[in-house]
Amino acid sequence: MHFRSAETAGRSRRGIVPSESMSRAKPKPAAPKPEALRGDHSKVVIVDGSNVAFSSEGERGVLKNIVTIRDRLVAEGFEPIVVVDAALRHKIDDEVGYERLVDEGVIKQAPAGTDADYFILSFADELNASVVSNDRFKDRIKQYPALRKRLIKYMIVQGEVVFEKRTGRRE
């Protein structure tokens, strides 16, 4: 799906679209209701990419951590959505690789000046998805109480991912 900016609205690939052709256009069908857009998201997992990047020791985030977690989830049959803070682009060990993954849509970067946690938890709530993160989200748990049952902790040991075994019990 492509979006046009306000600057390019009203233009076709060949130039300006005549205004009369716009007035003769067939009315668009009503947008589907949000429920219709939901579909089956049972395999969607939201990944706290900034948390994952900084799970290794050091002052810079490690892009390989994000890729390792994502690849493991894909191999397990899940559809990971990796969300990161905008500031991560300046704190990652492989800036070129990071920008490539953002451009490809593998990594979703929260808008600058916003808290990625809001987007992570909102997506998880909207899609009824689990969240891979070692963050406890203590400041948001009252707003998103279902998070207690959906939060999946992890470790990366010698390049291998170990996810917390879920027992269904959570305090």
Model-identified regions with their sequence ranges:
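Acidic, polar low-complexity linker/tail segments
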Residues: 3-42
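Nuclease catalytic cores that cleave nucleic-acid phosphodiester bonds
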Residues: 42-47, 52-63, 67-171
